[in-house]
């Protein structure tokens, strides 16, 4: 099973790095499943390498883990001011490579023309996900759901 997991990791990461136009990493640098991509990659290709790396692990967990699959949270994927070609690749990559039946929470200032075919929540208050006017409603809803867990 270990060999299957490691093989899957290498295959996925190699494929994802190519899709995201990351060519500066050698296979020897990312071949070990314990490698730390963030310390090996610099510049504008670093965010793309990290997205490839994280999505590889999302797919590994989906395929090989029996535990509950958590939502994927990607905040501001346009790091290091990607050029237009690369930000397009990043957005399309996220859209096309989200593991099947997974929930994605994507924090974006702009969609760059990619239709993620999902519910969009527009935040209107800086540094706030919830609005003060909604606290009581959300509190009641959450208490109700938590109470159901204990029944």
Segments predicted by a language model, with ranges:
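Extended helical coiled-coil dimerization/tether regions that scaffold
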Residues: 1-42, 63, 67
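C-terminal lobe/lid and adjacent interdomain/linker elements of RecA-like ASCE P-loop ATPase modules
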Residues: 87-151
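GG-anchored amphipathic helix commonly corresponding to the ABC/SMC/Rad50 NBD signature/C-loop
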Residues: 46-71
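Short, well-ordered alpha-helical segments
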Residues: 3, 7, 11, 47-52, ...
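Conserved ABC ATPase signature
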Residues: 31-54, 77-85
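Hydrophobic alpha-helix feature that most strongly marks membrane-spanning transmembrane helices
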Residues: 62, 78, 82, 95-103
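Domain-scale terminal segments
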Residues: 41, 67-68, 84-85, 100, ...
């Amino acid at each position: 099973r270990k060999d299957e997991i490691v093989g899957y990791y290498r295959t996925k990461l190699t494929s994802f790095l190519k899709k995201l136009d990351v060519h500066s990493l050698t296979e020897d640098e990312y071949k070990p499943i314990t490698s730390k991509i963030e310390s090996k990659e610099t510049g504008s290709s670093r965010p793309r390498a990290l997205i490839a790396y994280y999505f590889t692990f999302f797919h590994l967990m989906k395929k090989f883990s029996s535990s509950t699959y958590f939502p994927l949270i990607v905040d501001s994927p346009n790091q290091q001011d990607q050029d237009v070609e690369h930000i397009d690749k990043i957005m399309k990559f996220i859209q096309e490579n989200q593991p099947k039946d997974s929930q994605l929470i994507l924090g974006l200032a702009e969609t760059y023309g990619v239709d993620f075919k999902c519910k969009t929540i527009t935040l209107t208050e800086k540094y706030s996900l919830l609005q003060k006017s909604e606290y009581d409603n959300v509190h009641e809803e959450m208490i109700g759901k938590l109470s159901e867990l204990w029944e």
